[in-house]
């Protein structure tokens, strides 16, 4: 009954019926398009663009545009997209995922929605897993787009800025997920607007979408710079600050915990470091380190604000007195305290920018993807990316035979059987593709085949171009190919002459993967386009997945039945048990990714704010308005800190306020305590603001306006980049240590959100303060240059497709207490023979 209901209410069926209607309409235009000359076909592109500009939507143009691409493909590539490919194309245009089996022509399917969306002139990105595939597709499909009058760009790592700009300005850009992500990050670190390469993100089609959005979703892209000099500076600044005297060289205000160098202290610093002006822009870093060392010595007390444990400085929560593991003071204060305590200074890992694929791809207005296997992860695509998965039927029915798993007792027995199977098939000339989970396994199998004298190829996802050639040959008579899961993705295995009669390509899996999806990918390598084929998985009770989900009872059963290593179990029940184990692992992985995304969202919101504001700085001609707002909020904060509402005006610390103004905003004597006495905080703010504005105007008058504007931009960009870099670092440290808070009955995620928000507010305040100080205090030179705060290096996540190495399980003689007893009773060792031990 359930089966009948499912058929009636199957949403995929409804989708397909709708898609089929559209495909029929496209098909009906076939003869009309065939009558057009090449020139008339090319003219269609201009006609569509004009109609789009006049207000027709892409959906209105879809049927005709798809028909044009279809006809173009026939003339240029000699390929005519099938109806199922048109259906897949519609799914992609609608921003969903088309699940199309291997060999169904995904690359050609994508050309139709790519062309349609490129008519907007906003740029379409086609994303692949490696540069070999990007180059191959851009070259092959590029012929079709160029025939239809579109421009095609290829975005590879190592290209110059000009080459990248040209690639992104094309109608259609091919590239890898890594490169698109890194370009986004680099664009938000540029010092000149003209250096930006990407246009606003509009529409992307991701090939092998499951691999990029799920398997690699948690991989962060990181651009990092190193700060080698800084460790030395912390030590030098620390030694210098030890020589200073309170009230002579610096002033300290207990209430606001603010510490300032006096004129005398500033002179001392200039003498000690042999410089003429501490507030010169070229001494920003030194000044920063001296301020940090001062704060570490004067405002931070050991065993009150922090404790030292195992050579590490750990912060004490001022409200609860708990140790805040994993939290580090930001902006280098933590390192300054380490220098003060004579500990090893943890080198700042300068992450200049970072983003995960999940968050990068969620920024596109419209996102679509295609893959052979996505249905098992449908829930994740829907929840996180708001994409549906539509299973597109194959052009010809699949006649591959998927046999139930063969389960052996030990790994040794399993591999012996695999080699026998390969040898038997090789003898009759049937091509074999063997899939392994780890590189070690493929090397071990290769050794075993060498001993038997069977010629074969081994692929380990290291050299994409060469592997594509080998994989393409894997369907020839007598070919034996061993490949790790990811090797040669995106390349078709076409059958050689006479192979069909031998039963097509045989796919042998040597172990089940954690994810059903990857097993299905391996199976799908055989039986493309209605070819015959067979797939068979060999498992053993010692495989990792089997061990994780209780293979003891099976082991005991095999022993009781007196089965040895050479006799496998082949049963649907066991196959189902394996699948349910895989479902559990997939569920766990999904939860982990979902949780990570919630943590990541905190940084994502902050990143978007910072990047948006940074772009405004690059884009605006005159920053004075923005800077005045910053200075005003600094004045408000400082006045309010020194004149708390709960104190009577006589107790207000006006001396501290004047000292702050002298150190950061105004020349000495501009505002005195007498000027401020008897005034309300609002009046003080107005008075100080008027003085600051007057000084700002004086600066403006002394130098040409364009130089002043450039000076402002240098100061703001530097402050934002520096503080943001420290902030990313502090957020990462917070995230590493936050899970320890769960012991205190608090939700780590909420804590992370609250503290992350507070740290962000602190960072904004620090940016404003630094900008205010340098605008008001620095001397302006004629040869100002914008500077990067550190040289950025893109840290590539593991090379595409390289699986994290999984060690083969080695047998040990020692029996663990919870292991099955070696006597074969089926009980745990501790309840059986282990009792007496």
Swiss-Prot record:
Gene Ontology cellular-component annotations: cell envelope Sec protein transport complex; cytosol; plasma membrane
Keyword Metal-binding found: yes
Pfam families found in the cross-reference section: P-loop_SecA (PF21090), SEC-C (PF02810), SecA_DEAD (PF07517), SecA_PP_bind (PF01043), SecA_SW (PF07516)
Keyword Heme: no
Biased composition (Basic and acidic residues): 787-806
Disordered, as annotated region: 787-811
Keywords for the protein's UniProt record, in alphabetical order: ATP-binding, Cell membrane, Cytoplasm, Membrane, Metal-binding, Nucleotide-binding, Protein transport, Translocase, Translocation, Transport, Zinc
Chain segments annotated as coiled-coil in the UniProt record: none
Main localization, broad class: membrane
InterPro entries: Helicase_ATP-bd (IPR014001), Helicase_C-like (IPR001650), P-loop_NTPase (IPR027417), SEC_C_motif (IPR004027), SecA (IPR000185), SecA_CS (IPR020937), SecA_DEAD (IPR011115), SecA_motor_DEAD (IPR014018)
EC number: 7.4.2.8
Residues holding Zn(2+): 821, 823, 832-833
Entry binding sites for ATP: 85, 103-107, 492
GO MF, any single term: protein-exporting ATPase activity
Record's cofactor remark: May bind 1 zinc ion per subunit.
Subcellular location: Cell membrane; Cytoplasm
Required cofactor(s): Zn(2+)
Primary role: Part of the Sec protein translocase complex. Interacts with the SecYEG preprotein conducting channel. Has a central role in coupling the hydrolysis of ATP to the transfer of proteins into and across the cell membrane, serving as an ATP-driven molecular motor driving the stepwise translocation of polypeptide chains across the membrane.
Subunit structure: Monomer and homodimer. Part of the essential Sec protein translocation apparatus which comprises SecA, SecYEG and auxiliary proteins SecDF. Other proteins may also be involved.
Full protein name: Protein translocase subunit SecA 1
Source organism per UniProt: Geobacillus kaustophilus (strain HTA426)
Name of the gene: secA1
């Amino acid at each position: 009954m359930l089966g009948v209901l499912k058929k009636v209410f199957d949403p995929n069926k409804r989708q397909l019926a709708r898609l089929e209607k559209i495909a029929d309409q496209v098909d009906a235009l076939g003869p009309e398009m065939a009558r057009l000359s090449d020139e008339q076909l090319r003219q269609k592109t201009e006609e569509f663009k004009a109609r789009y500009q006049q207000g027709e939507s892409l959906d209105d143009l879809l049927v005709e545009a798809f028909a044009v691409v279809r006809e173009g493909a026939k003339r240029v590539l000699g390929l005519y997209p099938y109806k199922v490919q048109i259906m897949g194309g519609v799914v992609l245009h609608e921003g969903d995922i088309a699940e199309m089996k291997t060999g169904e022509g995904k690359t050609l399917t994508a050309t139709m929605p790519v062309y349609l969306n490129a008519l907007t002139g906003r740029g379409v990105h086609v994303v692949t897993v490696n540069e070999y595939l990007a180059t191959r597709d851009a070259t092959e499909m590029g012929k079709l787009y160029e025939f239809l009058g579109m421009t095609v760009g290829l975005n590879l790592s190592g290209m110059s800025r000009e080459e990248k700009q040209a690639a992104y300005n094309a109608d259609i850009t091919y590239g890898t997920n890594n490169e698109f992500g890194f370009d986004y990050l680099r664009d938000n670190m540029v010092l000149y607007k003209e250096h930006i390469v990407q246009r606003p993100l509009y529409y992307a089609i991701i090939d092998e979408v499951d691999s990029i959005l799920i398997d690699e979703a948690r991989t962060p892209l990181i651009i990092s710079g190193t700060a080698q000099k800084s460790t030395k500076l912390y030590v030098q600044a620390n030694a210098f600050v030890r020589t200073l005297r309170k009230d002579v060289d610096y002033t300290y205000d207990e209430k606001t915990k603010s510490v300032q160098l006096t004129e005398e202290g500033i002179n001392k610093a200039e003498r000690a470091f042999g410089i003429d002006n501490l507030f010169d822009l070229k001494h920003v870093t030194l000044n920063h380190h001296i301020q940090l060392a001062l704060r570490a010595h004067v405002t931070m007390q050991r065993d009150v604000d922090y404790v030292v444990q195992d050579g590490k400085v750990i912060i004490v929560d001022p409200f609860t007195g708990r140790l805040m593991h994993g939290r580090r003071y930001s902006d280098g204060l933590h390192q300054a305290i380490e220098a003060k305590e004579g500990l090893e200074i943890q080198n700042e890992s300068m992450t200049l920018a970072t983003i995960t694929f999940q968050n990068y791809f969620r920024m596109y207005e419209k996102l679509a993807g295609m893959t052979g296997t996505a249905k098992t992860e449908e829930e994740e695509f829907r929840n996180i990316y708001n994409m549906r998965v539509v299973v597109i039927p194959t052009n010809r029915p699949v006649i591959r035979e998927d046999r139930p798993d063969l389960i052996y007792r030990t790994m040794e027995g399993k591999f012996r059987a695999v080699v026998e199977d390969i040898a038997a098939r090789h003898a009759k000339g049937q091509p074999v593709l063997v899939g392994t989970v780890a590189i070690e396994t493929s090397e071990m199998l290769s050794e075993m085949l060498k001993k038997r004298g069977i010629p074969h190829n081994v692929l380990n996802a290291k050299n994409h171009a060469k592997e594509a050639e080998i994989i393409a040959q894997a369907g020839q008579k007598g070919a034996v190919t061993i490949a790790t899961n990811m090797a040669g993705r995106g390349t078709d295995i076409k059958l050689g002459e006479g192979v069909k009669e031998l039963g097509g390509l045989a796919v042998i899996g040597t172990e089940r993967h954690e994810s059903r999806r990857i097993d299905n990918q391996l199976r799908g390598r055989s039986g493309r386009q209605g070819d015959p084929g067979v797939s068979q998985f060999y498992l053993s009770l010692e495989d990792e997945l089997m061990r994780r989900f209780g293979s003891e009872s099976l082991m005991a059963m095999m022993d009781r039945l007196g089965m040895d290593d050479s006799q496998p179990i082949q049963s649907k029940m066991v196959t189902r048990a394996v699948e349910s184990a895989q479902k559990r692992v997939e569920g766990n992985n999904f939860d982990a990714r979902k949780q990570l995304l919630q943590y990541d969202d905190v940084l994502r919101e902050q990143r978007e704010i910072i990047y948006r504001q940074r772009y405004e700085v690059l884009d605006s001609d005159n920053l004075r308005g923005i800077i005045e707002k910053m200075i005003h909020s600094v004045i408000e904060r400082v006045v309010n800190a020194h004149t708390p509402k709960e104190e009577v005006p006589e107790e207000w610390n006006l001396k501290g306020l004047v000292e702050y103004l002298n150190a950061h905003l105004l020349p000495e004597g501009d505002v005195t305590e007498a000027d401020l006495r008897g005034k309300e905080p609002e009046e003080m703010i107005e008075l100080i603001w008027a003085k600051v504005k007057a000084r700002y105007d004086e600066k403006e008058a002394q130098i040409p306006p364009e130089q002043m504007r450039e000076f402002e931009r240098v100061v703001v960009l530097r402050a934002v980049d520096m503080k943001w870099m420290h902030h990313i670092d502090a957020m990462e440290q917070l995230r590493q240590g936050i899970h320890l808070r769960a012991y205190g009955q608090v939700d780590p995620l909420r804590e992370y959100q609250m503290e992350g928000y507070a740290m962000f507010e602190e960072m904004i305040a620090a940016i404003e303060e630094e900008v205010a100080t340098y605008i008001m205090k620095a001397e302006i030179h004629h040869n100002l240059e914008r500077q990067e705060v550190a040289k950025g290096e893109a840290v590539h996540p593991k090379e595409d497709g390289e699986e994290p190495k999984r060690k083969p399980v080695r047998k040990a003689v020692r029996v663990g207490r919870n292991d099955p007893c070696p006597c074969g009773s089926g009980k745990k060792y501790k309840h059986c023979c282990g009792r007496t031990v």
